[in-house]
From Swiss-Prot:
Domain statement: Domain I is involved in oligomerization and binding regulators, domain II is flexibile and of varying length in different bacteria, domain III forms the AAA+ region, while domain IV binds dsDNA.
Protein name: Chromosomal replication initiator protein DnaA
Organism: Geobacillus kaustophilus (strain HTA426)
Quaternary structure (record): Oligomerizes as a right-handed, spiral filament on DNA at oriC.
Record keywords: ATP-binding, Cytoplasm, DNA replication, DNA-binding, Lipid-binding, Nucleotide-binding
Location of the protein in the cell: Cytoplasm
PANTHER family in the cross-refs: CHROMOSOMAL REPLICATION INITIATOR PROTEIN DNAA
Example of a GO MF term: ATP binding
Region (Domain IV, binds dsDNA): 329-450
CDD domains linked: AAA, Bac_DnaA_C
HAMAP family named among the record's database cross-references: DnaA_bact
Main subcellular localisation: cytoplasm
Length: 450
């Protein structure tokens, strides 16, 4: 195994991409690798509160990340800077299992599901209502509703939560079902290990003999030709045998670069649904549910303050709440809006930049090309209107967090494929068309001045 300090740096780098910035900076950033004692990696936490929090809430994620990187299952033991012999401290641990990562095990399917991610703990809002309904339909009737189900959206919006919820629901209603959840990165690593050890059949048997396959972050297969080939055949085998496949990504299939067309087309066989950032009401509901689940007593004014300040994603939102609670505990002061502002000052910019809307883009593009606002929604196809409309669609995709269907709606109810076509066309022209480059630059400068 590599040097434990290098290993811990890699683990932290992986986890930083998976959890919110507030959570990472509060709990993990200041941790350090201490030693490797047999099957246990010992990590130093900055204080007793952080040690207990890490042990109860991050052990599973850390162990899973270590396994993804090394192919070995290590227990994780948290200690504090020793004023006493840390050998005397008691921590939760589990024994390392000596097995190949692709080897068949009885506990494999359920072990990778997070017990906190269920339909009961999922907060439904306008940005995720359709994705939630589709996920529930799939869980209630695997391979009969939508197969595959493809969920896409930004980081921390609930895609992984829904995938785990599907897995839990299926197992609860059919305990004998084989449900497998994994990331595409783990699929890739296990495939590489299987080829290296000349045991590809074990790998194939593991993933082609399941009832429900939940694979996260499929965009990471982009550019990995051999892994795409393997997943293509795995997909076909499962689909032909009426087994459910659920896939998540940070973008729709058509926008995943260097993804083979045959895989792209299969992802489009079933239902594609997106998740968008939560609105204010949903953010407050998320904070209330999180506070209740963790046993936090948070005043309404504090939850409103956090919800107004953090509007990017659920992971950042919950991380901010945890940071406020931790800060209150560490300085032994009551949680108030002022304390929340103090706790979050490092992660909330002093002046939030203006959010550009599709209407802003349409107005500025219309002024630039001397066309009316209503022309963007009209059926006109003359070049004097169609080309500025495509530029506005391109900028809407680049400068807003709106989904493809939402952008299409704002342009007269056009189909999302029209938005994709406009984005691809303008992107291609920008590589060689200097006049278009100037137009885009001037429009963006005007948008900055709004």
């Amino acid at each position: 195994m590599e040097n434990i300090h290098d290993l811990w740096d890699r683990v932290l780098a992986e986890i930083e991409q998976k959890i919110s910035k507030p959570s990472f900076e509060t709990w993990l950033k200041s941790t350090k690798a201490h030693s490797l004692r047999g099957d246990t990696l010992v990590i130093v936490a900055p204080n007793e509160f952080a040690r207990d929090w890490l042990d109860s809430r991050y052990s599973h994620l850390i162990a899973e990340t270590i396994y993804t990187i090394t192919g070995e299952e290590l227990a994780v033991k948290f200690i504090i800077p020793p004023n006493q012999d840390d050998e005397e401290l008691e921590f939760q641990s589990s024994k390392k299992k000596q097995r190949k990562p692709y080897e068949e095990t009885n506990d494999f399917p359920q072990s990778m599901l997070n017990p906190k991610y269920t339909f009961d703990t999922f907060v439904i809002g306008s940005g995720n209502r359709f994705a939630h309904a589709a996920s529930l339909a799939v869980a209630e009737a695997p391979a009969k509703a939508y197969n595959p189900l493809f969920i896409y959206g930004g980081v921390g919006l609930g895609k992984t939560h829904l995938m785990h919820a599907i897995g839990h629901y299926v197992i609860e209603h059919n305990p004998s079902a084989k449900v497998v959840y994994l990331s595409s990165e783990k699929f890739t690593n296990e495939f590489i290990n299987a080829i290296r050890d000349n045991r590809p059949d074990d790998f194939r048997n593991k993933y082609r003999n399941v009832d429900v396959l939940l694979i996260d972050d499929i965009q990471f297969l982009a550019g990995k030709e051999q892994t795409q080939e393997e997943f293509f055949h795995t997909f076909n085998t499962l689909h032909e045998e009426s087994k459910q496949i659920v896939i998540s990504s940070d973008r729709p299939p058509k926008e995943i670069p260097t993804l083979e067309d045959r895989l792209r087309s299969r992802f489009e066989w079933g239902l594609i649904t997106d998740i968008t950032p939560p609105d204010l009401e949903t953010r407050i509901a998320i904070l209330r549910k999180k506070a209740k689940a963790e046993g936090f007593d948070i005043p309404n004014e504090v939850m409103l303050y956090i919800a107004n300040q953090i509007d990017s994603n659920i992971r950042e939102l919950e991380g901010a709440l945890i940071r406020v609670v931790a800060y209150s505990s560490l300085i032994n002061k009551e949680i108030t809006a002022d304390l929340a502002a103090e706790a979050l000052k490092d992660i909330i910019p002093s002046a939030k930049p203006k959010v550009i809307t599709i209407q802003d883009i349409q107005r500025v593009v219309g002024q630039h090309f001397n066309i009316k606002m209503e022309d963007f929604k009209a059926k006109k196809r003359t070049k004097s209107v169609a080309f500025p409309r495509q530029i506005a669609m391109y900028l809407s995709r680049e400068l807003t967090d709106c989904s493809l269907p939402k952008i299409g709606d704002e342009f007269g109810g056009r189909d999302h494929t029209t938005v994709i076509h406009a984005h691809e066309k303008i992107s291609k022209l920008l590589q060689t068309d200097t006049q278009l480059q100037r137009h885009i630059q001037e429009i963006q400068e005007k948008l900055k001045q709004l």
